[in-house]
Amino acid sequence: MKKTTLKFAALTLLGLSNLALADAASELQMRLAKVDVLSAEFVQTVTSGSGKNVQQGSGKLQIKRPNLFRMETKTPQETQIISDGKTLWFYDPFVQQVTAQWVKNAVNNTPFVLLTSNDNSHWHQYTVTQQSDTFVLKPTLSTSNIKQFDIRVDANGILRNFSTTEKDGQTNLYVLRNITNQTLSDSLFQFKPEKGVEVDDQRKK
């Protein structure tokens, strides 16, 4: 009888845990869905696994639901991450190189796209827990380079900051400021490599 009671208690706790994870994921998606368009400047802080600040940067973030995402880092080195909903582009103007990946294959290592995604197949690649206005996402696949992805978004759907923590403990924190909700053209989320840019098209692999 005692073993049966313990087993029942364990199953109950497991069920409650799964329910809490589902509720956190639903709450996060609901909050993100409240804002269809967002533009903001960001300040980036890179911190080593030992807690040392190793780099500061800045740039601009633009998102448009569903599935459109653009993040341009201006300093210390210009880079662009652009999603048109199907392809995710990583562009480095300094070395004139761009990598193209299918969004569905990139979510595991690039959780930024979740900020605008309604696709359950994307969200199922992460577990979600909630700590007030901060949501902690952890990849379900061990092959991910990301240890966790934190999103701070308030009850009105305003995105305040987000961060990635890599397996070696390095953290990239992006704090948003000068947030606006002005209309954005879909053309901002299109990318066409210029002549001379080397393209690593991983969609063909």
Swiss-Prot record:
A Gene Ontology biological process in which this protein takes part is: lipoprotein transport
Q: One GO cellular component term, please give it.
A: outer membrane-bounded periplasmic space
Under the heading Pfam families, the entry gives: LolA
Keywords, in A-Z order: Chaperone, Periplasm, Protein transport, Signal, Transport
| Keyword Chaperone attached | yes
Q: Which residues form the signal peptide?
A: 1-22
Q: Which InterPro entries match?
A: LolA/LolB/LppX (IPR029046), OM_lipoprot_carrier_LolA-like (IPR004564), OM_lipoprot_carrier_LolA_Pbac (IPR018323)
**Location of the protein in the cell:** Periplasm
Role noted for this protein = Participates in the translocation of lipoproteins from the inner membrane to the outer membrane. Only forms a complex with a lipoprotein if the residue after the N-terminal Cys is not an aspartate (The Asp acts as a targeting signal to indicate that the lipoprotein should stay in the inner membrane).
**Summary of subunit composition and partner proteins:** Monomer.
PANTHER family listed in its UniProt record:
OUTER-MEMBRANE LIPOPROTEIN CARRIER PROTEIN (PTHR35869:SF1)
Family from the record: Belongs to the LolA family.
Query: What name does UniProt use for this protein?
Result: Outer-membrane lipoprotein carrier protein
Q: Which gene encodes it?
A: lolA
